[in-house]
Amino acid sequence: MFRQEQPLAEGSFAPMGSLQPDAGNASWNGTEAPGGGARATPYSLQVTLTLVCLAGLLMLFTVFGNVLVIIAVFTSRALKAPQNLFLVSLASADILVATLVIPFSLANEVMGYWYFGKAWCEIYLALDVLFCTSSIVHLCAISLDRYWSITQAIEYNLKRTPRRIKAIIVTVWVISAVISFPPLISFEKKRGRSGQPSAEPRCEINDQKWYVISSSIGSFFAPCLIMILVYVRIYQIAKRRTRVPPSRRGPDATAAELPGSAERRPNGLGPERGGVGPVGAEVESLQVQLNGAPGEPAPAGPPDADALDLEESSSSEHAERPPGSRRSERGPRAKGKARASQVKPGDSLPRRGPGATGLGAPTAGPAEERSGGGAKASRWRGRQNREKRFTFVLAVVIGVFVVCWFPFFFTYTLTAIGCPVPPTLFKFFFWFGYCNSSLNPVIYTIFNHDFRRAFKKILCRGDRKRIV
């Protein structure tokens, strides 16, 4: 978003330009090089070609990965959950960074001056801050959505409609715009010590101390702090609910941990529709929900415990299944509903055995419960393993976010308070921040089976017609 140059007059710096021989102007101007000769490029031909190739690969990888995310969400039924609209909006922001920002940053870097005129300079600066800030705020919104879906369980999942998600996305873009547009409103033209315009056209953003500090807080430090606190809280909840083995939990204790988990809802979100019974299964589904990346839905009803998710009823209800499996499910599903209809309003719900993992699973009798000790122990060990994997996912999500953006925003803030930062180091941190746009598709999809399956169908020509 911002680039540093050699020290400028009045403590300003050039946010987008490359190292320049003149260091006295903090505004855009269109004067020619002294003597009317050709401008000297800041890099040799070999270095320039290397930079162009690296930046070109970054742009291609960013566009390709994020386009795959968008296509997968809109073509795969298993990914049509409302919360996946966050991923679509995030991918769109990253694509815009790669197409409308990085190319001009690259040209400005290798040419050593701004070639594209004053009007586009101001638009470019605003778009740069807007798209990069939007990408970061999207990650923060995804973490909050995940936290609410866990702490409020069924209640929030019922409210998580496409309209609500779209409203949150609009809010994300509005916040990003509020952070991005002040530079245009308070854009000042400064001159060097001599009062003369510089020899090269330059494109620089507002370098006032108040804006540097406020934009750094709004664009990075505040969202980063929110993400870290939210994910720490999510991990604490998961750790507390998996510390005690299911054999030591009572039905009442388990039901009390998640609001609304002990009673059947009039909308059908009970055990028949992917909800879980009051014997510890809901806690296990919570843990598996945490095991995925933010915003990812779980596949519907497979036997694998990793696929259990409290959000099944709203996210993966239409997950892909072989044609024969749909017909074979009608019998057990109908039987399960018939048994549920026989439960009177005052009766307690039947307890589920340890093997009940999917939709319409049969209830367990006393004999099954007595022989289920080994299965419970196995599931307990599975939950411990999932907790470790969940820790790894959190480390990836938070670690990559901080590693990509913290160095830039930290050094950017240092320049506002007068601390000198080596220009080469600042440039490296600036481009390293752009890498986050290309890594988002990897971070938020590599741990999700539905995305991997959708990507395979998109990339394999023979299977394209079978995408559902």
UniProtKB/Swiss-Prot annotation:
The modification Omega-N-methylarginine is found at residue 370. Residues 1-48, 112-121, 189-207, 418-427 are extracellular. GO terms for cellular component: cytoplasm; dopaminergic synapse; plasma membrane; presynapse; receptor complex. Glycans are attached at residues 25, 29. Residues 351-366 have a biased composition (Low complexity). Residues 315-332 have a biased composition (Basic and acidic residues). PROSITE patterns: G_PROTEIN_RECEP_F1_1, G_PROTEIN_RECEP_F1_2. Retina, brain and olfactory lobe. Disulfide bonds join 121-203. Component of the ADA2A-containing complex (ATAC), composed of KAT14, KAT2A, TADA2L, TADA3L, ZZ3, MBIP, WDR5, YEATS2, CCDC101 and DR1. Alpha-2 adrenergic receptors mediate the catecholamine-induced inhibition of adenylate cyclase through the action of G proteins. Component of the ATAC complex, a complex with histone acetyltransferase activity on histones H3 and H4. This is Alpha-2A adrenergic receptor.
